[in-house]
A protein has these predicted regions:
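Right-hand nucleic-acid polymerase module
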Residues: 1-127, 137-269
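Conserved, short, structured surface segments that act as functional micro-motifs
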Residues: 130
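Long, low-complexity, serine/threonine/proline-rich intrinsically disordered regulatory regions
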Residues: 133-134
């Protein structure tokens, strides 16, 4: 270990990645824990980590052509009686999408999805139930995807409500905005689903690239806040955000970078 700074690079597909620069305690090495936090602080940290992982998972799997952003709601008379019924409606919808793809011998769909209600633990959690999905179902048209939001069979089949479907258009190589939209209202009751086989973000750790002295100098002279400065450190990447935080207890700086490929292979349909 050289100087006690870890570069933690999270590679999410070919066009998006995040980089954390973390001060290491003297006894830490790659793969070792860095100590324990209080239960409440750890709970908040776990929540932030889960949200970051979701953003990374979305960008690792859905920055590609043909991805659809699907929002499902209910019309009067079709509102589910409770959260569980609403969630089953969405699961059944995703099963119909997968069944139609399999019937046509198309690639297996990939998705992340959430059922959302009102504030959890209150009488409001069954109000305004709705669903958000990021869907990759190559070979299916938008009309077909929308028509599957229904119930019943044959002449009894009818729509459950409104479907808002649009093509994903990543901003600067990522779908952060959509992911954060799905994470909104953290106090609301939510249930998450994802298809099997999604690619995991790739974690790369380097404890020898930077030193504490370097990081301290960059944070105090302002370089650490400059996106152009970091773009020189990571050629072919454009830095979208450089976030610097000072931990008063540890007396050390933490740096978090978000970046995307300057020559993104993405093109809008």
């Amino acid at each position: 270990m050289r100087g006690g700074v870890r570069e933690k690079k999270i590679v999410c597909g070919s066009v998006y990645q995040e980089v954390d620069l973390i001060p290491l305690r003297k006894e830490c090495r790659a793969g070792e824990p860095q100590g324990r936090e209080s239960s409440e602080k750890q709970k908040r940290a776990n929540q932030r980590a889960a949200e970051r992982h979701f953003v990374q998972l979305v960008n690792a799997n859905f920055v590609r052509k043909g991805v659809l952003l699907v929002d499902l709601t209910y019309v009067g008379g079709e509102e589910p009686e409770d959260f569980e019924r609403a969630d089953r409606n969405m699961v059944n919808y995703l099963r119909r999408v997968c069944y139609l793809s399999a019937k046509r011998k198309l690639p297996k769909p990939a998705f992340v999805a959430v059922t959302e209600g009102g504030a959890e633990g209150t009488g409001e959690e069954n109000h305004r139930l709705h669903h958000h999905i990021i869907l990759y179902a190559p070979g299916l048209t938008r009309d077909e995807v929308e028509n599957l939001w229904s119930t019943g069979r044959g002449w009894k089949r009818h729509s459950l409500g409104r479907v808002n479907t649009r093509r994903a258009q990543p901003v600067r190589g990522s779908l952060i905005e959509r992911a954060m939209y799905m994470l909104k209202a953290p106090k609301h009751k939510k249930r998450w689903h994802q298809s099997l086989g999604l690619k995991k973000p790739v974690l790369k750790i380097n404890d020898a690239r930077y030193t504490k002295r370097q990081v301290l100098r960059w944070c105090t002279n302002g370089d650490a806040y400059d996106r152009v400065f970091w773009e020189k450190k990571y050629p072919s990447w454009q830095v979208e955000e450089a976030n610097v935080e000072f931990n008063e207890i540890e007396g050390a700086y933490y740096i978090r970078l978000r970046m995307w490929r300057s020559k993104s292979p993405w093109s809008r349909e």
